[in-house]
Each structure stands twice: as C-alpha cells, then as structure tokens.
C-alpha cells in the first residue's frame, strides 16, 4: 500500500482533527471546481505535496491534472464515505507493506501508522524526503522496497 488513503479510518478511530483536514481541503476544491476554476485541483496537489507543489509541476503535468479533475472529483466524492472499522483491516491475512513519504501530510502519516497497527503482518516503511507522489519522485527507492517485499514478504 503506497500512500494509501482510506480517510474514513481516521474518522472511525477518533482522529477527528486529522480527518477534518481532508474535509476543509475538499470543500475548497469542490467549490472552486463548481465555480469553473481550471486549477481547482491544486488544492489536492498542495495538500499532499505541500504549498506550491502544483505550481512547481511542469506545464504538461499541470495540464494533465486540470484535464482529469472531473474524474478526481468523482474519486473524492466516492472515497470519503469509505469508513470500514478496525476489525475489517484485521481480516487482511496477507503480508502487507505500507509505504509512506517521510515529508507527507500529517494525516497521511497517521493513516500509514494505523494501517500498520491494524493489519496483521503489516510493515511500515518511510521513504525519506518523499510525500504522496512517491512513484514520481522516488521510483528507485519505491521499486527497491516493493522488490524486497515481493521476494521475501518483508521490507
């Protein structure tokens, strides 16, 4: 699980302040999208990567993000209601690698910790200097962790 975001895990575990951060971000994001602002998705990108991340992306990436914003809005609209209890995660029987970026959003850092606590046979790995965009920013380190996990079941 790379930067997995079952947001409801925060809510069902009483991490209300962290859960509220997602609510604040999506309210702004959805409102700007509905108002027709082309760069509304910058709220999501900057939430995960830090202020200014969207603006720092190459134009080609920003254009892609803008083009795919309607699909991302649907993802956010449906994903925020995913609220399975801790017991659901305790049913996962396979060896699970949970990977997070060391510079990630505090809510994402906590979700990774909780997944590791709740899933039996889960291990947490933190990629130094990374955030939510690990496949793009740290592909070699991520591939190394995944290779180890697939080969040995651990990382």
Which stretches of residues belong to each language-model region?
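Flexible "cap/lid" loop of the alpha/beta hydrolase fold
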Residues: 1-32
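Conserved strand-to-helix beginnings and helix N-cap segments that scaffold or border functional pockets
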Residues: 12-15, 108-112, 136-140
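Acidic/histidine-enriched, beta-strand-rich ligand/metal-binding domains
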Residues: 17-20, 41-50, 111, 115-118
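Short helix-adjacent coil turns
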Residues: 25-40, 137
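Alpha-helical elements of Rossmann-like donor-binding domains used by nucleotide-donor carbohydrate transfer enzymes
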Residues: 28, 39, 43, 67, ...
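Conserved alpha/beta-hydrolase catalytic His-Asp/Glu region
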Residues: 34-73
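Conserved serine/cysteine hydrolase catalytic core
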Residues: 61-117, 123-126
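Catalytic active-site module of serine/aspartate enzymes centered on a nucleophile-bearing elbow/loop
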Residues: 120-155
